[in-house]
Amino acid sequence: SAASDVYKRQSVNGFIKIYDPENNQIFVNKRNAIHYENMSYALAESLSNSGQGWIHEINFGNGGTSIDPTGIITYLTPNNTGVNASLYNQTFTKIIDDRSISNTDPVRNKTEVRHVSGTNYTDLIVSCLLDYGEPSGQDAFDTTTDANSLYVFDELGLRSWNPAGTGNLLTHVVFHPVQKSLNRLIQIDYTVRVQSLSGLTGE
């Protein structure tokens, strides 16, 4: 129903910005799809102090688009249904939980909660930096013509943590292909806005 749709769109929203922090070139700046089933479960797990459910990593992939011989790009629909949803073709993962011992750079790969007193929404800011040397095996320069190269990313998503190491996909965004290569940094600023359902403001 329309009311149900409004509920889903307004309770949790996602926004993503992907750019080169050296020259501020913006590659992606858009909303993204929320996996409402998995997100609701993760929120409940976190609130209940169950020891799992928080955002742990960003998954990167190269299966979100297809390009025909004339250069026309087709964007696939984000995977935001089914508890076992995943990226179309995951090729890299970066841990952004700054409390995790597996996070190799918690200063630049972290989560932060931002709230302004008196408002009915709170932002969770996820920061992720792909440094010059990562991922291992990338091309030296961002000049590839192969859109299916492992590190030409066109999709990414936030994933939660659980003890089995098989956390759930919480968000999924598909975008114009962006190559990660040795000659460039890529910064991802990912905002998840959690908003109450009364007095919907702050859009």
PLM regions and their residue ranges:
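Small cysteine-rich, disulfide-bonded extracellular modules of the LU/uPAR three-finger superfamily
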Residues: 4, 8-153, 161-203
